[in-house]
Swiss-Prot record:
Membrane topology per record: Multi-pass membrane protein
Protein name: Phosphatidylglycerol--prolipoprotein diacylglyceryl transferase
NCBIfam families, A to Z: lgt (TIGR00544)
Naturally occurring in which organism (per UniProt): Helicobacter pylori (strain ATCC 700392 / 26695)
UniProt GO cellular component terms: plasma membrane
Keyword set, alphabetical order: Cell inner membrane, Cell membrane, Membrane, Transferase, Transmembrane, Transmembrane helix
Effect seen on changing residue 87 to S: In strain: HP439
Residues annotated for a 1,2-diacyl-sn-glycero-3-phospho-(1'-sn-glycerol) binding in this entry: 155
Name of the encoding gene: lgt
């Protein structure tokens, strides 16, 4: 047993308190994720204006729509997919975003679904771009290249918050014994950090490669969608399935099943992008 294995015993998920309000590291990590994604997108606009012909003010307005869509979609998606008491929230809709418990204590908003956030993001992007759909793919590509590094902070936040823990490390796994984290007297994979690397860093490199080798609008979001789906599918083998969900056919987790649906959505965007690029060439 090394110091890393027992890091949770030495770490408090609460960063600091403001009176009765406890600020968790996860909240700070999420803020870093938003800032990172925002400024990464601005950098891309400045560095490659031909691929991303968008004014800063225009992007700032769009970013607010996208972030709102992500938050709404992520929270509602969690309620519909993962929350065992979803019926209560559907009849008490205002409680979905209530950051206080029954005693009036601030506890924050817990329970977000990445795939729900993705749906919310796509809906918000479409609504914002509906008057000029030619820019829709440009916006999606811009987020595809700026989101992965922000995502890294989000998963680090999950790790610091000691949530979304990994599966139990087999006793014959030498690497697992080294990198595992003790959670409730069980050595588990640090699945949050595995996801940060696979779904954040690796996917970012995939999208950057696609940016260098493609010119068609919409292909970056397709590469992101397919790349994330693959990396999430792999990472789920190290992540403990939600206790209220378990596994389904072929022992697949809900995250893996939703990732398969994400592949279908990505292929749909690919078809749309292909048709859209043909129209642009014809008009030119």
């Amino acid at each position: 047993m090394n110091a890393w294995n027992t890091i949770y015993d030495q770490f408090n998920p609460i960063a600091f308190s403001l009176g009765s309000i406890e600020v968790h590291w996860y909240g700070l990590a999420y803020a870093c994720a938003i800032v990172t994604a925002f400024y990464m997108a601005l950098r891309m606009i400045q560095k490659d204006p031909k691929r991303f012909p968008i004014e800063r003010k225009e992007f700032e307005s769009y970013f607010l729509w996208a972030e709102l869509g992500i938050v709404l979609g992520a929270r509602i998606g969690y309620i519909l997919i993962y929350e065992p008491n979803s019926g209560y929230y559907l009849t008490h809709f205002w409680q979905i975003f209530n950051p206080f418990d029954s005693h009036g204590n601030f506890v924050g908003i817990r329970g977000m679904s990445y795939h729900g956030g993705l749906v919310g993001f796509l809906i918000a992007s479409y609504l914002y771009s509906r008057k000029d759909l030619k820019k829709l793919l440009i916006y999606l590509d811009l987020i595809a290249i700026s989101l992965p590094l922000g995502y890294v902070f989000g998963r680090i936040g999950n790790f610091l918050n000691q949530e979304l823990v990994g599966r139990i490390v087999p006793k014959d796994s030498h690497l697992g014994q080294i990198i595992g984290i003790m959670v409730d007297n069980e050595l588990r994979y640090p699945s949050q950090l595995i996801e940060a690397f696979l779904e954040g860093v690796i996917v970012f490199l995939m999208v950057m490669w696609a940016k260098k080798h493609t010119k068609t609008h919409g292909l970056l979001i397709v590469v992101y969608g397919l790349g994330y789906s693959l990396m999430r599918f792999i990472a789920e083998f190290y992540r403990e399935p939600d206790s209220q969900m378990g596994v389904y056919f072929l022992n697949l987790s809900m995250g893996q099943i939703l990732s398969l649906f994400m592949v279908i959505v990505s292929l749909g965007i690919l078809l749309y992008a292909t048709k859209n690029s043909k129209k642009i060439k014809e008009n030119q």
